[in-house]
């Protein structure tokens, strides 16, 4: 498989496309969060599979991880990472819970985290499909009961040449004027990256031809 080469301009374009999608996701999340929500993509990087596994494994002991796979024309996944503090605050705001016990998660709380992941991933995927004219969808989110590395290996085994393009998404959640950040990881495999680059490059060529013909 060819090694993808991404220029700085193309990185910026991909980040901007994702930011447009995340803006819609933030609006959807704000409805249940009952406050302002800001989502943005602060970083984009190509990383090796082993590094991806290490990256998500370090969160396992301190965060509840919700996974949603992206399927169709693109192949990837989103991981939302919730700490005990995040879960406590979201439970109070969205479920009107009082005296939330940290470290113990009820069925209702898990359903809330799944719904938040579903809203954000669903809105993001819909916008990406519209912008990139592609047929993609998000699978129902799940909270892996085994190690997240094992859950991700299911994807990696199916795609042995998987060299993920990883986006770290900063979810900034404002509650009572206090800003809380929820980490979210979004990654695509190499094939998907090549498809996205091809769409961007084709659009750039078409735009250039239109300008020259005017």
What feature does the model see in each segment?
Residues 2-26, 30-214:
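Composition-driven recognition of glycine/serine/threonine/acidic- and proline-rich low-complexity segments
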